[in-house]
């Protein structure tokens, strides 16, 4: 089967895409040093291409050279696969694959059948072979990494003739290693990383866009947030990346200026939605009086950026906002427990959450305790009412329980460090995965993802494992970047506990402790991938994907510093994702002006 799209059958919700003939005036304002667009769309030029037009063009281009479609496609389905896989990869890289989910699923089903037959159209081309492996594994198909074993050893690859784009595809495939025993992918990752780094060092990639793409992948592959990856790919997009002859003819016609304009405008629509959500979060923050607190981290913009970066669909606005609200609330209360509040005040917040009842102002003990409790109380009560509608049942008790659990861990950690209690690494990790906040943020926001979540699902071992693995990744990577600061504050984490446990071994260094912590994080990341990619589990894939997205946040924040507390790279990324719209390609803009 060839990849063909039916314009009439492809759903475009009002939230997902507007008519491409709409042209909104652009108004710029400045918010804390950032330019902001206040209109409903950030289209800087009028593009004479409607959604229906684009779907028609896609259907037309994908038919190929034989007008007797799809009959001709049924004759040689394997021959279409290289171009189909390149198209799927491009739709994903440019962030518009959500419009074609059913079509993509159909193609991957066909691809898997060809994979099982070891069809030459897939296996004879190294780049297509690697791409098929990656797309199928991520989708949940059982594909053995041993199929890539011929490329695992650098000695079996002609490094003088192999193209950089092909090595990139091998590198991307190697990132999907889920098992400890997948030695082929481990070897593949090692030599492709070395090869690409050497290409950068010797400045031997003449294509500037390809050079930047290699830099981007090598910088922090596990920490590429979905929408940041889309932004980067839109900036660096080049059809010549796909050089397989079968793909090139058909594919180059589709990926024209119109298609790129569609993807860029879709990005701008999502960006405008993220700006609107930031304004909502800022109003909520002020309504909760959290802006009056004189201590701790104000992470409203950070929370908005992180949620916008991992959850792109415009219709999932509630998911993003609820997730961001809980990042803010958890951070504020964590800072209170760690630095601002007295032990008694911290205990008081937990008692209030357990009782779940508003009090006269005098009974809170301090204004800060009142602000923090009422912020949680009012926010969760409102969310519980809305979640009741979404879920068709009351989930209020479950949501409150999540808050009781995380604050109980905050209290336990406060007591441990305040009393200088001896702690083993296992003791620490058994609780600290909860206090990192991933679990509460994910399960709170997931109530609004559009899927009914039963108690059986939420209380299942699978849910616990998903929460624990993603939280362990974020906790361990956070510990690696913050252990020096926490040691000065007389608190501990996994790195300091590893050092303490090996204090009698003079050869055990900080570097060794960091290496072990990173290995533990990587092990949990792979275990998380195994659960997410596995089919037939209690959680639908859309829910499980949320955990993998949050895992990328941890890899993004703590790759080389603490971007959450001291954002540097994040500030630049925030500008490009939330504040700076993409312009239509100059050629398209010129064509439009000439009409």
Curated annotation (Swiss-Prot):
Enzyme Commission code: 4.2.3.131
Cofactor list: Mg(2+)
Protein localization: Plastid, Chloroplast
Lineage: superkingdom: Eukaryota
Keywords, comma-separated and alphabetical: Chloroplast, Lyase, Magnesium, Metal-binding, Plastid, Transit peptide
UniProt pathway: Secondary metabolite biosynthesis; terpenoid biosynthesis
Transit pept. (range): 1-47
Induction: Induced by jasmonate (MeJA) in roots.
Residues the record lists as binding Mg(2+) 1: 334, 338
GO-annotated molecular function: magnesium ion binding; miltiradiene synthase activity; terpene synthase activity
Catalytic reactions of this protein: (+)-copalyl diphosphate = miltiradiene + diphosphate
Any one annotated GO CC term: chloroplast
Residues that, per the record, bind Mg(2+) 2: 334, 338
Chain sites annotated for binding Mg(2+) 3: 478, 486
Keyword Transit peptide included in the entry's annotation: yes
Keyword Magnesium appears in the UniProt entry: yes
Protein purpose: Involved in tanshinone biosynthesis in hairy roots. Catalyzes the conversion of copalyl diphosphate (CPP) to miltiradiene.
Domain comment, as recorded: The Asp-Asp-Xaa-Xaa-Asp/Glu (DDXXD/E) motif is important for the catalytic activity, presumably through binding to Mg(2+).
Protein name, entry field: Miltiradiene synthase KSL1, chloroplastic
Organism: Salvia miltiorrhiza
